[in-house]
């Protein structure tokens, strides 16, 4: 069950709350994970559900973490976003219903997709901590 807005305001930073609950966007190149190079898993800051692997992360030059695919396509929800005078595809986490960012059809192969994700919506779990933090079942992604 998703925490109440009051609980989320206590638990998240103002930026994390704005991004995940109000569909905000953090500044490019001034966010926690755009240049993260370690191997690991990116999980939803609200629910902890696994979202993206460092194995699918690449430098898109945009200043936000970019991925070619989610860990589990069923773990995300895509919605049409018509804000800012354009039509884009918003990406949200399925269980936490957190706004994560957007997906664009201009990524590298093999998918041709660029999941442009706000660092503020994510928590990074280094590969060496996966077992301890309950994500041991995903270690196969890094072998």
Swiss-Prot record:
SUPFAM superfamilies: Mss4-like (SSF51316). It comes from the Bacteria. Signal peptide: none annotated. One of its GO terms (biological process) is protein repair. InterPro entries: Met_Sox_Rdtase_MsrB, Met_Sox_Rdtase_MsrB_dom, Mss4-like_sf. Gene3D superfamilies: Peptide methionine sulfoxide reductase (2.170.150.20). It is an enzyme of class 1 (oxidoreductase). Residues 1-30 are annotated as: Disordered. GO terms for molecular function: peptide-methionine (R)-S-oxide reductase activity. Pfam families: SelR. It catalyses: L-methionyl-[protein] + [thioredoxin]-disulfide + H2O = L-methionyl-(R)-S-oxide-[protein] + [thioredoxin]-dithiol. Residues 1-10 have a biased composition (Basic and acidic residues). Transmembrane segments: none annotated. Its EC number is 1.8.4.12. The active site is at residue 116. Keywords: Oxidoreductase. GO terms for cellular component: cytoplasm. Belongs to the MsrB Met sulfoxide reductase family. This is Peptide methionine sulfoxide reductase MsrB. It comes from Nitratidesulfovibrio vulgaris (strain ATCC 29579 / DSM 644 / CCUG 34227 / NCIMB 8303 / VKM B-1760 / Hildenborough) (Desulfovibrio vulgaris). The gene is msrB.
């Amino acid at each position: 069950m998703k925490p109440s807005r009051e609980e989320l305001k206590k638990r998240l930073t103002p930026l994390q709350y704005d991004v995940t609950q109000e569909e905000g966007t953090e500044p490019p190149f001034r966010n926690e994970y755009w240049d993260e190079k370690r191997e690991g898993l990116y999980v939803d800051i609200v629910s902890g559900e696994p979202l993206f692997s460092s194995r699918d992360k690449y430098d898109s030059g945009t200043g936000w973490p970019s991925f070619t695919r989610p860990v589990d396509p069923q773990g995300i929800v895509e919605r049409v976003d018509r804000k800012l005078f354009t039509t884009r595809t918003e990406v949200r986490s399925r269980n936490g219903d957190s706004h994560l960012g957007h997906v664009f059809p201009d990524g590298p192969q093999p998918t041709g997709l660029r999941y442009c994700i706000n660092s503020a919506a994510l928590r990074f779990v280094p590969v060496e901590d996966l077992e301890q933090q309950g994500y041991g079942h995903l270690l196969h992604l890094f072998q």
